[in-house]
């Protein structure tokens, strides 16, 4: 039994980042419900007890990361999903992905270890961080390819404002 190891490519972290960046606070209830109901379909009800708290920390990691990047003014972000994407948008998303993955890997595992009374090693935290970053990159790459194909087939139009 290897215990809790985390995912090496965790796609939902990319969903958290994209949905919060584009839709703001309005996305949080839907993201939270997805966080707690998705795993409960796979595992038993016991899973729901401690994951509700861990899900809150995962979502707060993204919120805090967005606020840190906004506060630092390292990059600005175009908050309209229909406008043309530029380098500043990618830079903003990359910073949010890295910072939120770091916070998520540390604080979610801290909460899980406190509630479950188990020690979680540094390799698990590193695996969470790598999984969140890689999953976000895969998710965003998929969206870029999909929207590019939709635009080429004239099923989607970019506003130039």
Regions found by a protein language model. Name each.
Residues 11-27, 31:
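Generic transmembrane alpha-helix motif of multi-pass integral membrane proteins
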């Amino acid at each position: 039994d290897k215990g809790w190891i985390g995912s090496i490519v965790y796609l939902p972290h990319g969903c958290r980042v994209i949905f919060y960046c584009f839709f703001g606070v309005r996305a949080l209830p839907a993201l939270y419900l997805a966080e707690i109901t998705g795993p409960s379909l796979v595992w038993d009800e016991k899973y729901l007890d401690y994951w509700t708290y861990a899900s809150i920390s995962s979502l707060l990691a993204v919120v805090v990361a967005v606020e840190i990047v906004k506060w630092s003014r390292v990059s600005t972000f175009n908050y309209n999903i229909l406008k043309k994407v530029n380098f500043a948008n990618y830079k903003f998303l990359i910073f949010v992905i890295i910072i939120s993955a770091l916070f998520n890997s540390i604080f979610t595992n801290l909460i899980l270890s406190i509630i479950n009374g188990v020690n979680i090693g540094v390799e698990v935290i590193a695996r969470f961080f790598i999984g969140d970053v890689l999953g976000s990159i895969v998710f965003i790459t998929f969206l870029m390819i999909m929207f590019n194909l939709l635009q080429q087939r004239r099923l989607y139009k970019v506003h130039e404002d």
